Swiss-Prot record:
SUPFAM superfamilies: Peptide deformylase. Removes the formyl group from the N-terminal Met of newly synthesized proteins. Requires at least a dipeptide for an efficient rate of reaction. N-terminal L-methionine is a prerequisite for activity but the enzyme has broad specificity at other positions. It comes from the Bacteria. GO terms for molecular function: metal ion binding; peptide deformylase activity. This is Peptide deformylase. Belongs to the polypeptide deformylase family.
Length: 162
């Protein structure tokens, strides 16, 4: 396993669209291991492959919950709720900053696992935010593109209205 360098927000690679993974081989499995090690070392809960400089549609997530460590290869959101929520987000590629972002309250993600099987997972509340945030990276979008200019009180009021 090896730590990889996290690309920062001014790196042009973060604005590029990642490519589908065609074959899950030992190299892909090594990249995934390195991504987890890098994510844990930097105290993150999610990491997209582009954040370590490779344009591959791979995301790793570990929210320390019942789903445990997740590897999502070629993920896509196939369902999302009309109901929205606003939550605070940060990013390992944008250190020292955070901001409020509106995202669907619930999403269903279809992806390929490390064994080549198609899977589906539902994320609600903060997990939905995490899925959307990481999948945005695969399309060259940073959370900072979506930040709302709201106070904490405004966010609480808006979330309670829903």
């Amino acid at each position: 396993m090896a730590l990889r360098q996290i690309r920062l927000e001014n790196d042009p690679i973060l604005r590029k669209k990642s490519r589908e993974v065609e074959k899950i081989d030992d190299r892909i499995k090594q990249i995934v291991e390195d991504m987890f090690e890098t994510m844990y070392e930097n105290k993150g809960i999610g990491l997209a492959c582009v954040q370590v400089g490779m344009l591959k549609r791979i995301v790793v997530i570990d929210m320390q919950d019942e789903d445990g460590k997740m590897v999502l290869i070629n993920p896509k959101i196939i369902e999302k709720s009309e109901e929205k929520q606003i939550n605070i987000e940060g990013c390992l590629s944008v250190p020292g900053k955070n901001g409020y972002v509106e995202r669907p309250k619930t999403v269903v993600v279809e992806y390929t696992d490390l064994n080549g099987n198609t899977q589906r997972v539902m994320g609600t509340d903060y997990k939905a935010h995490c899925f959307c945030h990481e999948l945005d990276h695969l399309d060259g979008v940073l959370y900072t593109d979506k930040v709302l200019n709201l106070s904490e009180e405004e966010v609480e009021r808006l979330n309670n209205e829903k």
